[in-house]
Amino acid sequence: MSNYQDFITKDIVGVDVLKASDCHFPVPFNVPAIRSIPLSAMPTAYYNFGVNPNKNANYSDEVDGDIAIKSTNKQSVQGNIFTYDVTATIPSVSSIPDSIESGLYHQDFHLIIYFADGTSKLCYGLPNTTIFTSSDNLGSNSSNSIKITVQSMNKLIDII
């Protein structure tokens, strides 16, 4: 059985990308009773796209564009695996900066997703399951896209 959910694009205002190596969360990721995590436990974001509520992001250039998140839940004997596909379309950029690509390839990371109502949620990625993909579409209407795929054993965790 697989459940599918698209978050409404207009409700998402930003996404922070956190390198897993920079994160030291105070709770284990696979305990079902964990419904929230304190904001103070969040490290500085490596990269942000969309509106940046976290002004402490290491990479200061924000990417303006459309953000979409697709969530898929696959249920198996071993448990639930949630897959989150985050896509940002970036108009009028000649190419995605090398500093972004080199910093995110071959890395495990977690995501903080910011919503228009002021709430934020953590997507805790499982080790060795994160994928970073970028593409450049050059022409009269140049655009680029960044896609981040994260697998998790949890639904999105509320940040309080």
Where are these predicted regions, by residue range?
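Viral virion structural and adsorption modules
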Residues: M1-T9, M153-I160
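Solvent-exposed edge beta-strands and adjacent loop segments
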Residues: S2-D85, P127-G139
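Hydrophobic beta-strand residues in large extracellular and virion-surface proteins
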Residues: V15, V86-A88, L111-I113
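Oligomerization/assembly interface segments of phage tail-like spikes and tubes
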Residues: N73-S95, S140-K155
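Short acidic, glycine/tyrosine-flanked loop/strand segments centered on an H-E-D-like triad
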Residues: D85-I90, A116-I131
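Short, conserved charged micro-motifs
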Residues: S95-S102, I157-I159
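Short, acidic/charged, Gly/Pro-enriched secondary-structure junctions
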Residues: D98-L122
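Mixed-charge, glycine-accented linear interaction segment located at domain edges/termini
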Residues: C123-I160
